[in-house]
Amino acid sequence: MSFFGFGPAAELDIALTDGESRRRAEHKTEDGKKEKYFLFYDGETVSGRVTVNLRNPGKRLEHQGLKIEFIGQIELYYDRGNHHEFVSLVKDLARPGEISQSQSFDFEFTHVEKPYESYTGQNVKLRYFLRATLSRRLNDVVKEMDIVVHTLSTYPELNSSIKMEVGIEDCLHIEFEYNKSKYHLKDVIVGKIYFLLVRIKIKHMEIDIIKRETTGTGPNVYHENDTIAKYEIMDGAPVRGESIPIRLFLAGYELTPTMRDINKKFSVRYYLNLVLIDEEERRYFKQQEIVLWRKGDIVRKSMSHQAAIASQRFEGTSHPETRPQHSGAAAVEQEHE
């Protein structure tokens, strides 16, 4: 606010050099809404222009300098106000002086390191943003622009299937199998459940995808479980020897890549939870962790050299055993013949 309370004497605007052509990505905000932001990858250059728009053109505006920052930070909601910055770059755009008319200043942050994926969770937020600051003697004029960063991964070198036998002695014995342990965000989970022994009356069976967010360290560790999806496998009583196929499409759910010990502040892990409910409403369940990763999209011409190389890894050939399966439940069975 200005000295007389009539609002700031100037406004700042940030525009990206490739703003008209750059892809946007949806990202969840703190209030749960989805908004679109400019999408960047690790290693890409961030460039643009900061414009100082005077509220009263012709009237001189004194300032103590203009700067632009590129910031990556983590905010833990239980520790509001204490931001942990893991990327902090700054460029001075104008020295202290006077401005008498609206003026624009170009900036460029070359091949910027963006090591983590943007994330908004239950107890933590990881964000990247540009912040322009026009320093003034009384109150600074500040403008921020958020961007979204996606981290790309290569095909896992090892991606073994998951096969387990679980049960209750002399009551229930089942074998479940998933075709892989690592899935990209638009993958399909293919598997089967085989009933070896059934002496209790099962009336319902489902698979849940559970996201577990862990924040903090030491005594200040918080766990937040969120059921992302519920997939009904069967509704009715199974019999011994029955085999039930599983085919769960991940593309329809709001998922992120698995994140482990991000900047020693938080982790995000995913689990498949097999749930059985008997006629007396007793619940039996077995959890199995899976790894989620983001598959690269088609390389955009405007990407920097580093980001292009990272994305091209996806488009090249992969080992036969790591290539995604497309043959349905039969692929699972063949792996264990």
Swiss-Prot record:
GO terms for cellular component: cytosol; early endosome; endosome; endosome membrane; retromer complex. Residues 313-337 are annotated as: Disordered. InterPro entries: Arrestin-like_C, Vps26-related. Component of the heterotrimeric retromer cargo-selective complex (CSC) which is believed to associate with variable sorting nexins to form functionally distinct retromer complex variants. Signal peptide: none annotated. Belongs to the VPS26 family. The lineage of its organism: Eukaryota, Metazoa, Chordata, Craniata, Vertebrata. It is found in: Cytoplasm; Endosome membrane; Early endosome. The gene is vps26b-a. It is a peripheral membrane protein. It comes from the Eukaryota. Keywords: Cytoplasm, Endosome, Membrane, Protein transport, Transport. This is Vacuolar protein sorting-associated protein 26B-A. It holds the Pfam family Vps26. Acts as a component of the retromer cargo-selective complex (CSC). The CSC is believed to be the core functional component of retromer or respective retromer complex variants acting to prevent missorting of selected transmembrane cargo proteins into the lysosomal degradation pathway. Retromer mediates retrograde transport of cargo proteins from endosomes to the trans-Golgi network (TGN).
